[in-house]
């Protein structure tokens, strides 16, 4: 009797139609364990899409999907974002920013699969006219500011390498850049300057935002030095929802539309967000289902406003899982900037004819990017910030005045140290990729002022 029970509930002789209560309980326990591990999930008995009898799971209160349909749904969102927004052209080389977390891990997997599919299509094509886009991976090493033991850090970085190298084909190169490299000069290592600059920022929120700006600067540096045409971020709907609320609290409402679009061309190398419609819970669950290895050992704890907002979003998610999508959709209704789309001549020639008109119908006034951007965070200036900048240009006596005027109000109050002398030293520590632009503007301003003064003196001499 015991043997019969064992063979009918998962033993070696268990048949495909076994209906043992013990077996059902085991399945339910496994599903509950997965739900607890991933977060608040809705469990159902069957898939709402294919109607299969397998256990189904849904995130954010959506329709229950089996594992295959759930994965296909996320991949479909990713592909739709990439193709309908012309994120990647066949001639592009794309740099994927990889942090080791679930979002960037899924982005890496999906873009890898898209490239493999493109290679297959190219192989069977008779003309083989269009090339296949390339993919590189970048990881910004911030361990210089981490208190963890060095051997743990090196082990985590090695895990990052192994995750990328586990992909069979398609990755052009793996770039691991130290955060302090953007501070380095020919005569000085950047670690001291980075530490000193960070220590001068007294506000926890400002310190986090400053590091986020440096992270983007590091990615831009990698992309420019290695010939990449796009930078792909793993920012998902959950992360964007947190950013929407935190930016509102910080007074960055004017520049907010720039950060929530699929495409952002204000940078030297354009940035794209193909996971904008996917929730963090969904991406974490997919990593669990597909056994996609992640590495988050190097994540730094969040403090200040960003931490409070993340906790608030978590509470909202527990009450109503769809709140994150609601926040993002609300922010998307704000009017985007001219740099939130690709509008270069000939850019969309590779697109299918049915999609091309969508991108060619733009106002000629919006085709030229004319926004003034913050020196550090890249936020477009509001009207009041522009007025302050113009006023400072006319009366500025020192270079530091132009530096501070080229910072948005959020960076000015949260990142810059108080006091003119401290500001001068702080700006002297910043990467040349930032201050070099301001030096050029300052020199042009000084030259123009000298020419005006010389002209006025000549007029006075003629009058005498």
Swiss-Prot record:
Cellular component terms (Gene Ontology): cytosol
Gene Ontology molecular function, alphabetical: nucleotidyltransferase activity; sulfurtransferase activity; tRNA binding
Organism: Oryza sativa subsp. japonica (Rice)
Biological role: Plays a central role in 2-thiolation of mcm(5)S(2)U at tRNA wobble positions of tRNA(Lys), tRNA(Glu) and tRNA(Gln). May act by forming a heterodimer with NCS6/CTU1 that ligates sulfur from thiocarboxylated URM1 onto the uridine of tRNAs at wobble position.
Family statement: Belongs to the CTU2/NCS2 family.
Stated name of the protein: Cytoplasmic tRNA 2-thiolation protein 2
Record keywords: Cytoplasm, tRNA processing
Alphabetical list of PANTHER family matching this protein: CYTOPLASMIC TRNA 2-THIOLATION PROTEIN 2
Biological-process GO terms, alphabetical: protein urmylation; tRNA wobble position uridine thiolation
Chief location bin: cytoplasm
Subcellular localization(s) per the UniProt record: Cytoplasm
Pathway: tRNA modification; 5-methoxycarbonylmethyl-2-thiouridine-tRNA biosynthesis
Gene3D superfamilies linked to this entry: HUPs (3.40.50.620)
């Amino acid at each position: 009797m015991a043997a019969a029970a064992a063979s009918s509930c998962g033993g070696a002789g268990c048949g495909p139609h076994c209906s043992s209560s013990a077996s059902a309980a085991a399945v339910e326990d496994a599903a509950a364990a997965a739900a607890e591990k991933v977060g608040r999930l809705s469990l159902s008995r069957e898939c709402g899409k294919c109607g299969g009898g397998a256990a189904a799971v849904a995130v954010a209160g959506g329709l229950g999907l089996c594992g295959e349909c759930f994965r296909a749904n996320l991949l479909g969102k990713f592909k739709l974002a990439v193709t309908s927004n012309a994120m990647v052209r066949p001639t592009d080389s794309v740099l994927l920013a990889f942090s080791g977390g679930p979002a960037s891990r899924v982005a890496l997997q999906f873009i890898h699969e898209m490239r493999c599919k493109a290679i297959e299509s190219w192989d069977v094509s008779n003309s083989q006219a269009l090339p296949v886009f390339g993919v590189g991976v970048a990881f910004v090493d911030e361990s210089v500011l981490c208190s963890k033991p060095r051997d743990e850090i090196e082990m985590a970085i090695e895990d990052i390498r192994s995750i990328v190298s586990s992909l069979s084909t398609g990755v052009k190169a793996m770039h691991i850049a130290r955060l302090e490299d953007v501070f380095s000069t020919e005569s000085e290592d950047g670690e001291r300057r980075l530490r000193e600059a960070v220590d001068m920022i007294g506000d926890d929120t400002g310190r986090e935002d400053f590091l986020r700006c440096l992270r983007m600067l590091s990615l831009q540096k990698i992309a420019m030095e290695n010939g990449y045409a796009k930078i792909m971020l793993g920012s998902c709907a959950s992360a964007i929802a947190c950013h929407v609320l935190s930016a509102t609290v910080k007074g960055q409402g004017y520049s907010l539309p720039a950060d929530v679009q699929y495409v952002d061309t204000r940078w030297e190398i354009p940035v794209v967000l193909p996971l904008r419609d996917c929730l963090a819970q969904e991406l974490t669950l997919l990593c669990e289902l597909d056994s996609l290895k992640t590495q988050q050992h190097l994540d730094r704890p969040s403090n200040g406003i960003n931490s409070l907002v993340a906790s608030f979003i978590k509470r909202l998610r527990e009450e109503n899982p769809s709140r994150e999508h609601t926040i993002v959709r609300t922010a998307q209704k704000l009017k985007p900037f001219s740099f939130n789309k690709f509008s270069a001549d000939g850019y969309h020639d590779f697109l299918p004819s049915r999609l091309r008109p969508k991108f060619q119908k733009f106002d000629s006034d919006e085709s030229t990017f004319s926004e003034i951007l913050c020196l550090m965070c890249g936020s477009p200036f509001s009207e009041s910030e522009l007025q302050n900048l113009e006023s400072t240009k006319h009366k500025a006596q020192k270079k530091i005045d132009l530096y501070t005027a080229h910072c948005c109000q959020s960076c000015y109050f949260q990142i810059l140290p108080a006091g003119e002398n401290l500001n001068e030293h702080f700006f002297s520590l910043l990467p040349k990729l930032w201050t070099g632009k301001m030096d050029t503007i300052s020199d042009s301003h000084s030259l123009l002022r000298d020419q005006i003064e010389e002209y006025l003196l000549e007029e006075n001499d003629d009058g005498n």
